[in-house]
Amino acid sequence: MYYLALNPAVQSKLQEELDEALGRESDPIASSEIVKRLPYLGAVINEALRLYSLSSMGLPRIVPEGGVQVSGKFFPEGTVLSVPSYTIHRDPEIWGNDVEAFRPERWLEQDQAGIQKTFNPFSYGPRSVTIKIRNCFAEGSNQIDSC
């Protein structure tokens, strides 16, 4: 909601998508089937979670037997490696030069398979939790301008 308040154009675009989807239904509460078909809602939620993940820590992994080479550096077996989500979510090579900007459109412009590999706002299981957030948002906030 913070980013929607700061970005009236994003708020308007999202409100249009919600109005269009919910305007066709007799029930003002969106079903999960409707929510799945709201790409801009998903982009807004993902972009907010990219910038402010609920978990900033990465998932630690132990280097297997024989060690591993990562970006030209060797790590011996038993070494614990982890990359914080904060760092991954702000990599300009993945997200573009405007990495610090709240820009949901990046989720609609870029290769979804590629960015999903690096999008990890909850340390694990991002898709299932993101779907729950989308459902809660659509069910409880179909009037964005009143938030």
Task: Give the label of every model feature segment.
Residues 1-17, 132-147:
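Cytochrome P450 catalytic-core helices
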Residues 59-65:
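Short, structured beta-strand/loop micro-motifs enriched in basic residues and often containing a Trp
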Residues 27, 61, 91-96, 115:
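A generic "cationic amphipathic patch" detector
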Residues 12, 83-111:
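Conserved cytochrome P450 K-helix/beta-meander segment immediately N-terminal to the heme-binding cysteine loop
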Residues 3-55, 71, 76-79, 101, ...:
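Cytochrome P450 I-helix active-site segment
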